[in-house]
From Swiss-Prot:
It is found in: Secreted. This is Potassium channel toxin alpha-KTx 14.2. One of its GO terms (molecular function) is potassium channel regulator activity. Inhibits potassium channels. May be active towards small conductance calcium-activated potassium channels (KCNN, SK), and less active towards voltage-gated potassium channels (Kv/KCN). Its main location: secreted. The lineage of its organism: Eukaryota, Metazoa, Ecdysozoa, Arthropoda, Chelicerata. Keywords: Calcium-activated potassium channel impairing toxin, Disulfide bond, Ion channel impairing toxin, Neurotoxin, Potassium channel impairing toxin, Secreted, Signal, Toxin, Voltage-gated potassium channel impairing toxin.
Amino acid sequence: MKIFFAILLILAVCSMAIWTVNGTPFAIKCATDADCSRKCPGNPPCRNGFCACT
């Protein structure tokens, strides 16, 4: 049973790392570029009301 939970934990950590590298898995609304710099890594621009985190 411990091995099963260890595998689940590894999968969760890896999926979170992939989301961090590729950007957020969901759209983040913004009004200005400053909103995105607080919510996304790498200071992405605000396009059409959403942050370009990818």
